[in-house]
Amino acid sequence: MKKIFFIFFLIWTSLSVNAGVFDKKNAFLKAEQAFVFTESQQNDRLSLNWDIASGYYLYKKSLEIKGENGQLFIPQLPLAEIHQDDFFGDVEIYRHQLTFSLPFTQLSATKQVEITYQGCTEGFCYPPETRVIALTSLERESGQISSAVLKEESVLSELPLAEQDRLAAKLIESKYAVFWFFLFGLGLAFTPCVLPMLPLLSAIVIGREQRPSTAKAFGLSVVYVQGMALTYTLLGLIVAAIGLPFQVALQSPYVLLTLSAIFVLLALSMFGLFTLQLPVSLQTKLTQYSQQQKSGVFGGVFVMGMIAGLVASPCTSAPLSGALLYVAQSGDLFTGAITLYLLALGMGLPLIFITVFGNNILPKSGNWMIQVKNAFGFVLLALPIFLISRVFPEIEMPLWFSLAFAFSLWLLYQFRNNKGVWVFTFILGVMGYLYYSYAMNRHTPAHQTTSLSQFERITSYAQLQQVLSKNPNSLAMLDLYADWCVACKEFETHTFSDVAVQKAFTDVLLLQVDMTKNSEANRELMQKLHVIGLPTLIFFNQQGQEIEGSRITGFMQASPFVDWLQKMKSIQPISQ
């Protein structure tokens, strides 16, 4: 068993070490070298030119020219080439060179234009590039851009992406992104939301009067994983297509509390307090039906796999968020289904290995199984604590401490004749108590109340624009919050209440929108800001404009969040 875990550990760590296969920094040109941009203003026209390196191309649909007030200018573009893209299908592109011009009469309502474009090459895509051109001189030298603009672009280029955005970008860059989802799934298999599923599957396969054969154990585990894979595939497609309304239903406190109650019952049954079973009469009928149709047991395992997929979904981590973001950006439902299926298959592979190999390694049934069953009960109790704490964060630490204390007492009883275990457990208990005391003092309700009181509530997009216009010299952060959003509560409890974060907030305008009711004003604001789900944090500069590449669309711990804020602030002194 240890060898199996070691193999999976090597696979996951090698994936992290070799993450550079996505970048290929030495194999590709820098964006400014691949797409050499120049501009000139003469003869009452603004001329734009891109010299495109061999093997590289620009997307026609990515070209966008905006004025300082956000108005769009539509240029007359030359005929584009049709290209079969790995992710977007048939797209129009430009190779070698792109040149066009705009008359100043068309640009008379603005003093500057913002030009956005994006290019790719085989197996690699660049993030969108933006150039700002001031229209103050008709004889401006070709390619000249203000130092302030260059400085801002330099700062933005160094800005770290959020974890889910960084993952999505790497996946889109990779030609074989679909297959990488399988490896990411292996990593997700060891997250707190998936790990508790291991004893549940073991109970299905091993916890029978007669242990199933290796072939049947393999079959049960595969069917279980297929049920989980189906759930994740459908979940990903629904989230990508619907967004917020589905999040509302799935992350509702009622759903989380119901799931928690189910796992508490399962844990109590594993402690032997009672046996969960159907009435004898119904069991007899089901047994007869099962004998007539051999797939009955497998069908039940398939349904349990689907349920396991739903249980894990509220605890979506950054890699899964990146996967969903990738599906949303690809726009291809078939590709999205395949990628998320492989993600779930990777998550289920460790379950299959543990079930099959564990079935042969474990000794015959005996008293040891009672101890294992009780231990699994403690593991099952961890998941409801994890879920309940997202609805009632103030009781998270007391619940974890209570579970750890109960497990320690049980462990000491099992090894009551082993002094070494007593000493080791005592040391762990002292360390756990010290950490508990520290955590309780660090995240008190007073701290949380203070952090929330700093936010100014926004109810509409119009009000947001008005507030931003009255604070032109402040960095503003907009927090899209909802009571049903469990990750939003994590931000409040673990991030916003942190002392270092509170200190970093001193010169930041803090705004918050309550999206709980999903009202018409909420939907309008989401549409205007292009928000697909919660939590979402958006940063605005001193002009009230969103800072490009600065969004946070998933939970972030306090330390990296402080670094993020410092990066945002480093952009603010720039004046154009």
From Swiss-Prot:
Mind listing the UniProt keywords for this protein, alphabetically?
Answer: Cell inner membrane, Cell membrane, Cytochrome c-type biogenesis, Disulfide bond, Electron transport, Membrane, NAD, Oxidoreductase, Redox-active center, Signal, Transmembrane, Transmembrane helix, Transport
Question: What ranges are annotated Cytoplasmic (topological domains)?
Answer: 199-229, 275-295, 358-367, 416-419
What are the BP-aspect GO terms?
A: cell redox homeostasis; cytochrome complex assembly
Q: Which GO terms describe its cellular component?
A: plasma membrane
User: What's its top-level EC category?
Assistant: oxidoreductase
Listed transmembrane segments: 178-198, 230-250, 254-274, 296-316, 337-357, 368-388, 395-415, 420-440
Q: What is this protein called?
A: Thiol:disulfide interchange protein DsbD
| Residue numbers on the Periplasmic membrane side | 20-177, 251-253, 317-336, 389-394, 441-576
Q: Which organism is it from?
A: Pasteurella multocida (strain Pm70)
The EC code for this enzyme is 1.8.1.8
* Signal peptide location: 1-19
Q: Which family does it belong to?
A: Belongs to the thioredoxin family. DsbD subfamily.
Question: What residue stretches are annotated with the Thioredoxin domain?
Answer: 433-570
Print the organism lineage.
Answer: Bacteria, Pseudomonadati, Pseudomonadota, Gammaproteobacteria, Pasteurellales
Q: Which HAMAP family match?
A: DbsD (MF_00399)
For whether the record's keyword set contains Membrane, the answer is: yes
Give the protein's function.
Answer: Required to facilitate the formation of correct disulfide bonds in some periplasmic proteins and for the assembly of the periplasmic c-type cytochromes. Acts by transferring electrons from cytoplasmic thioredoxin to the periplasm. This transfer involves a cascade of disulfide bond formation and reduction steps.
Question: Domain of life here?
Answer: Bacteria
- Cross-referenced PROSITE patterns, in alphabetical order? THIOREDOXIN_1, THIOREDOXIN_2
Q: Which Pfam families has this protein been placed in?
A: DsbD_N, DsbD_TM, Thioredoxin
UniProt topology in membrane: Multi-pass membrane protein
